[in-house]
Structure formats: C-alpha cells, structure tokens
C-alpha cells in the first residue's frame, strides 16, 4: 500500500492585491535610485504615486489594438550602457522600451522585476509594438528625466550667476570711472571768487583801510627782498666758482677733502 503526498500549489495573487502591493512599492520608491539584480539600476519617477500621471499606450499589430501603460521610471544597464523606459501594464506587468529595439517584456510583476529579474530578460521577450504618448502620438526620445531637468536648472542657475558676476564687475568698474556730470553742476571747493573792485570794502572817503595798506607794504617789501636774494650769488655758485679756479690736474678728492 503506497502513500501519496501532495503540496498545495501557491496561487497567484489576485489583481486587486497585486495592484495594492505595486502602489505601495511605487509610493515608497518615488524619486529614488534602486539597485537591480546583476548590477544594473532603476530610477523611479518622482511623481509615480500620483494617479493619472505619465501614462501612454502601446499599439500592437492589428486594428485598434492599444494597451494602456503607465510610465514608472528608467532602467540602466551599466555594463552595456543601454537605457530603458519602464512601463506598467493594466495587469501590472513590467515592460521596458528601448529606442531602436522596441518593447521588452521584463517581468510579470514589479516585485519580480526589482528582486529577481532586473534587466536579465531584456533580450529574451521582445514585443512588436509602437510606443505612443497619452495623445496617441509616436513617442519621441530622448525624454527628459528628473536628473536631466535638475541638470538643466543647474545650468540656468550657473548662467544667471555668471551674468550677475558680470553685472557686479561692471558696477565695480564703473565706480572707478568719473561720473558724466556736466561741469555746470560741479561745485568746486577752491578759493571763493574775488569781488570786483567796486564792491571791495573801503575806508572813509573811498580809500582802503589802514590794515590793508600795511599788508600791501609788507608784501611789496618782501618781494623786493626776495629779488635781492635771487640776484646775489648763492653758496652753491660760490662753491662752483672755487671748483673752477682749481687746477685741472687736481682730483675730486683734493677739492672736497
């Protein structure tokens, strides 16, 4: 008499449970970089948790065959440098779209893709379809990712900063330049203008006061004294004449010592 044993087969999770699990995982990984099995990586879109964001379609062969998909991020094969746009289908299968090779079936669920599969099946299951946008237009690559937008913002900030530096440099250089102010508006701090002779203060009888007269006399006498000093031979002239009177054979040391 033989014995037979059997194990209960693991049932696939229902679609509602799979949808809930996928939503929780995407909400937790939104905007993050996750390592994939095999050394590759995936970058989850920052707005992936919002409903109705970044959706598109895949057109399969046949009349009016469109599959609704949702964009969730980008996957990078670091060894080969290949890049895939990741999409989730209505039954939460993971697809990767590469420019030139088309659509790849990567995993049956997001859990399998992140934990087991990664990009290992990128060349095994290739689906013949055309990627379309939410307006049913052909998908044009490359699409700007979050890192591309951050790089663009950083470049704009650098340009603004450079222009600000140039503006500050022009302002600093302009401070060393004279301002273009007309001469009529400039007030000099020199000697005040002299009054005409008709407005000068005079003493009695229209004559200048005695103090001004004495100042004039002192000025005239000082000028005469300076003239006499200029006309008289100075000490330097006398020394020069003495040097000239010396014999031509005498050295410079004999003159000064």
From Swiss-Prot:
**Basic and acidic residues bias (residue ranges):** 214-240
Species, as recorded = Equine herpesvirus 1 (strain Ab4p)
InterPro entries in the record, alphabetically? Answer: DUF1314 (IPR010741)
- What's the protein here called? Gene 3 protein
Q: Where is the composition biased (Polar residues)?
A: 163-176
Q: Where in the chain are disulfide-linked cysteines found?
A: none
Tell me where on the tree of life, at the top rank, the source sits: Viruses
Give me the ranges of the annotated region Disordered: 163-257
């Amino acid at each position: 008499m033989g014995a037979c044993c059997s194990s209960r087969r693991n049932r696939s999770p229902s679609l509602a449970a799979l949808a809930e699990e996928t939503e929780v995982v995407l909400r937790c990984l939104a905007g993050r970089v996750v390592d994939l099995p095999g050394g590759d990586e995936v970058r989850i879109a920052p707005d992936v948790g919002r409903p109705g964001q970044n959706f598109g379609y895949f057109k399969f062969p046949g009349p009016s065959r469109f599959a609704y998909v949702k964009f969730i991020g980008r996957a990078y094969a670091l060894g080969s440098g290949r890049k895939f746009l990741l999409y989730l289908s209505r039954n939460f299968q993971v697809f990767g779209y590469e420019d030139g090779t088309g659509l790849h079936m990567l995993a049956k669920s997001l859990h399998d893709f992140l934990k087991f599969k990664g990009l290992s099946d990128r060349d095994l299951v290739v689906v013949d379809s055309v990627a379309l946008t939410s307006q049913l237009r052909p998908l044009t690559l490359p699409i700007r990712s979050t890192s591309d937008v951050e790089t663009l913002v950083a470049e704009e900030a650098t340009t603004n900063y450079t222009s600000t530096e140039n503006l500050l440099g022009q302002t600093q250089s302009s401070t060393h330049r004279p301002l273009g102010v007309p001469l009529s508006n400039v007030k000099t701090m020199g000697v005040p203008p002299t009054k005409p002779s008709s407005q000068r203060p005079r003493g009695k009888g229209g004559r200048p006061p005695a103090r001004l007269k004495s100042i004039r006399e002192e000025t005239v006498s000082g000028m005469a004294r300076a003239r006499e000093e200029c006309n008289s031979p100075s000490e330097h002239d006398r020394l020069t004449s003495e040097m000239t009177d010396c014999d031509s054979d005498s050295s410079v040391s004999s003159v000064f010592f």
